[in-house]
Regions:
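Acidic/His- and Gly-rich active-site-bordering loop/insert found
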Residues: 4-7, 11-153, 172-181
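Acidic-enriched catalytic cores of C-N bond-cleaving enzymes acting on peptides and small amides
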Residues: 27-36, 206-214, 221-233, 238-247, ...
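Short, solvent-exposed loop/turn and secondary-structure capping segments
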Residues: 69-70, 132-135, 195-199, 227-230, ...
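Acidic/histidine-rich catalytic neighborhood of metal-dependent amide-processing enzymes
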Residues: 149-152, 156-237
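Short glycine/serine- and small hydrophobic-enriched flexible loop segments
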Residues: 167-174, 273-277, 363
Length: 423
């Protein structure tokens, strides 16, 4: 169940568009970059209420993507009108260019005062996956608030980011903010179904214009609270790479029959055994010298003894930390390629033994592995002698760009410099 903190929009505003944050130093962090906020970051009670209501309203618009050719276009059009109403300053500011791309996606170009600086891009998406009413405490498109949480499809994926970005820009503009560095805001309408008419068309448009970006900030990770045992405070995990994926279809073909005289093995039984092997044989743990290790080292002083000792001396305790990361399903996903059986299809009648059984397994590929490597391991584990791997959707994991990270840090430091104020 998606249950983000109500103040997530405010936090997104501060993090994404540079309303200065003041971090607590324990002696391990450089204090040189800590300074007074360039623009006051306090929100009035009226603004806080408006943030909540804006997110609730966005959740109530059922912008569902079922397939690349089956979208709720009525809701997508309604959402376009909704953001115009909720964020009027964004749409009327002279140095912001707004374009509709692919009918329902939105591209904002925010022109900065220094054109020599390379621009960056903030990403979010409008569409959500289908949400059957079953399993929800409240209707999935109600946007209801209970006990400090807002419920509904899109509260985490990904209308929280979308509304947070636009809310941040709206509030900054009201405070007479003009950025030094130009940036883009791209809001796709079909991200959940591969983004063919949204993200891909926005990308093609910017490529045709010769735009080169310093870095991109996408929907990223969550605010973790209680997921890592021993961590005393909530923390925001900044994702610096993107997992790849393979949606691998497995199929078993056998001779059909009648349930009154079943064979020793059936298509369903053979396939069930294959996917069970995949679930019981996880991909290798890739915890090593990458950003996950660096993040834990930075968090070391937030833990009590002896965890802080382990994390501060990773050269000695890395194998132990690696095993501990596997024990929690959230942190386990950070150290390996994950395996998730998401679809299983077979059978037409209760007394007929089906000839065909199909399953789709979703692998989210760790950046330290390749699509080919995961495909080989998966097919070997699934026993391809009796289980045929068929067509699959895949995308390559992104690499960690040190240059992009440096540009991102430079931009964050710019946000703490002397403000440029406009009319």
């Amino acid at each position: 169940m998606a249950r983000p903190y109500i103040c997530l929009l405010a936090l997104a505003a501060m993090l994404l568009l540079g309303i200065a944050t003041i971090s607590r130093s324990r002696g391990l962090r450089d204090k040189a970059h800590q300074s007074a906020p360039r623009i006051p970051s306090q929100f009035s009670q009226e603004e806080r209420v408006a943030m909540k209501e804006a997110l609730k309203g966005a959740i109530q618009i059922p912008t569902v993507s079922f397939s690349p050719k089956e979208l709720n276009t009525t809701a997508l059009a309604e959402f376009g009108e909704y953001i115009r109403k909720v964020f009027p300053t964004v749409f009327k500011t002279s140095f912001i260019r707004h374009e509709v791309v692919g009918e329902y996606s939105h591209l904002f170009t925010v022109h900065g005062s220094d054109p020599s600086l390379q621009p960056y891009m903030l990403l979010a998406h409008i569409d959500v996956v289908p949400a059957p009413d079953e399993g929800w405490d409240v209707p999935p498109f109600s946007g209801l608030e209970r006990n400090g949480f807002i419920y509904g499809r899109g509260t985490i994926d990904n209308k929280n980011s979308l509304m947070g970005i636009l809310q941040a820009l709206e509030l900054l503009l009201i405070r007479n903010y003009i950025p030094r560095r130009s940036f883009f805001i791209a809001l796709g309408h079909d991200e959940e179904v591969m983004g063919v008419n949204g993200a891909q068309k926005i990308s093609a448009l910017l490529q045709a214009r010769g735009v080169q970006l310093a870095f991109i900030v996408d929907e990223g990770s969550f605010i973790f609270d209680g997921f890592i045992p021993g961590l005393k405070n909530p923390f925001a995990m900044v994702a610096v790479s993107q997992k790849g994926l393979i949606n691998l279809m497995l199929q078993v073909n056998t001779t059909p029959g009648h349930s009154s005289a079943p064979p020793k093995e059936t298509s369903i039984g053979i396939l069930a055994a294959a996917v069970n092997r995949l679930e019981q044989t996880p991909m290798p743990n890739m915890f090593g010298d990458g950003p996950m290790k660096m993040a834990l080292q930075e968090l070391a002083n937030e833990f009590s003894f002896p965890t802080n000792l382990f994390l501060s001396n990773m050269w000695l305790f890395r194998p132990l930390v690696s095993r501990l990361m596997e024990r929690n399903y959230i942190t386990n996903a950070l150290v390996r390629t994950t395996t998730a059986l998401t679809m299983f299809n077979s059978g037409i009648k209760v007394n007929v033994i089906p000839a065909v059984a199909q399953a789709i397994v979703d692998f989210r590929i760790h950046p330290a592995q390749t699509v080919q490597e995961v495909h080989v391991l998966a097919t070997q584990t699934a026993d391809t002698i009796r289980t045929s791997p068929l067509a699959s959707t895949c995308s390559t994991p992104s690499t960690c760009s040190h240059r992009a990270s440096a540009s991102c840090m430079e931009s964050m430091r710019e946000s703490q410099s002397k403000p440029t104020r406009g009319k």
